[in-house]
Amino acid sequence: MVVVAILAAGRGTRMKSDLPKVLHSLGGRSLVERVIDSVEPLSPSRRLVIVGYQAEQVKTGLQSPNLEFVEQTVQLGTGHAIQQLLPHLEGYRGDLLVLNGDVPLLRTQTLEQLLQTHQTNQNAATILTSHLPNPKGYGRVFCNGNNIVQQIVEDKDCSPAQRQNHRINAGIYCFRWENLAQVLPHLEANNAQKEYYLTDAVTQVGQVMAVDVEDYQEILGINDRLQLATAYEILQRRVKEQWMMAGVTLIDPNSITIDDTVELQPDVIIEPQTHLRGSTVIQSGSRIGPGSLIENSQLGANVTVHYSVVTDSTIQDGTKIGPYAHLRGHAQVGANCRIGNFVELKNTELGDRTNVAHLSYLGDATAGTQVNIGAGTITANYDGVKKHRTKIGDRTKTGSNSVLVAPVTLGDDVYVAAGSTVTEDVPNDSLVIARTRQVIKLGWRRKSGES
């Protein structure tokens, strides 16, 4: 049995932000959300988040019924933060996994290894360590041949010989709670910062073993915007390597960004300057980009999207989007459609083999199959108070520069003459002409000049 405690009380002054550090976004999710997600496969019995600075904002940002919040009203160090758990874990006999809310790159497999080592060896505590190329500023961990911790020395207290040891304390711990609970009340703040350090408890609980994480990038903490950018680069490299090894082609990977919540199938091609975000799913054979943004959208097989923005929308197989199209607000586009340049779809549903080739706006509309929307057609969906829907039947065609004033329904096989402003429903198999008759006045320029 394991309880997880996540330290999320700090302000993060080096971020120079009013937003609590743990709520800053990394690849579409906050730092602390990434930490929480990493422990979910461990099936912890409880998930305790220790909050302090802007506590209510952090709670609001982490709305989940599975989380419990513990307040550290005054931030007096990591040891003091864990002391706040004493009344919440009274009588608990299992293990406590302690994580930092600003260390977002930890893999679940690393935490599983830490827990397994802890439980197999019946340790009082097990700590995560790593070997850094440049360990300056980190406490050094000294172990015997069996990885039993002998000593933890802060960087400022290291001798020249001790500084040659590059094994550092990552600040990730697993404790036998009974042992830790006995030590916590006796921690002292005998340091320049007058804080209570959890590392002081590590040396007092009993046998402590270290587990080394091979990829030191996993334990990198976020303290400023530069480190946040570095973490994003690491995350992107992981994600893009994963998809390329799974059969996805990335042309110029350095110019592409992909959230780790995106799902791609083999033989998808992503071109330069393309960004895939949120819960996007793209099926096999689709080609996205260059210069496109796809967010929270589902794209079928063999879809192409060029220089376009697609958010919160669904596109079926074989449809071509762009260049310079904008789909948003739960647009749903059928199979083998064409959405061309400078077309915007908002909360609109199009049937199969429907074309909106250029310079059109369809908002709050439904169109059937094999519809052709002429250049410059718009749905006037807003009357100044609320929005109304436009319904367009199968095989209907609108001429260039048509305005469909909602609420309005066009039946099947309707033809809308170019330049028409349609304000009333049109029955099936009809031609609608809604424009002023053309008038020609011969000799107009000469006569106007004489006057």
From Swiss-Prot:
Cofactor: Mg(2+)
Record text on cofactor binding: Binds 1 Mg(2+) ion per subunit.
Family, per entry: In the N-terminal section; belongs to the N-acetylglucosamine-1-phosphate uridyltransferase family.
InterPro entries in UniProt: Bifunctional_GlmU, GlmU-like, GlmU_C_LbH, Hexapep, MobA-like_NTP_Trfase, Nucleotide-diphossugar_trans, Trimer_LpxA-like_sf
One Pfam assignment: Hexapep
Function description: Catalyzes the last two sequential reactions in the de novo biosynthetic pathway for UDP-N-acetylglucosamine (UDP-GlcNAc). The C-terminal domain catalyzes the transfer of acetyl group from acetyl coenzyme A to glucosamine-1-phosphate (GlcN-1-P) to produce N-acetylglucosamine-1-phosphate (GlcNAc-1-P), which is converted into UDP-GlcNAc by the transfer of uridine 5-monophosphate (from uridine 5-triphosphate), a reaction catalyzed by the N-terminal domain.
HAMAP family according to UniProt: GlmU
The protein's assembly and partners: Homotrimer.
Keyword Methyltransferase assigned: no
Catalytic activities: alpha-D-glucosamine 1-phosphate + acetyl-CoA = N-acetyl-alpha-D-glucosamine 1-phosphate + CoA + H(+); N-acetyl-alpha-D-glucosamine 1-phosphate + UTP + H(+) = UDP-N-acetyl-alpha-D-glucosamine + diphosphate
Residues that, per the record, bind acetyl-CoA: A375, N381, Y382, S400, A418, R435
Protein name, UniProt field: Bifunctional protein GlmU
Gene name of this polypeptide: glmU
EC number: 2.7.7.23, 2.3.1.157
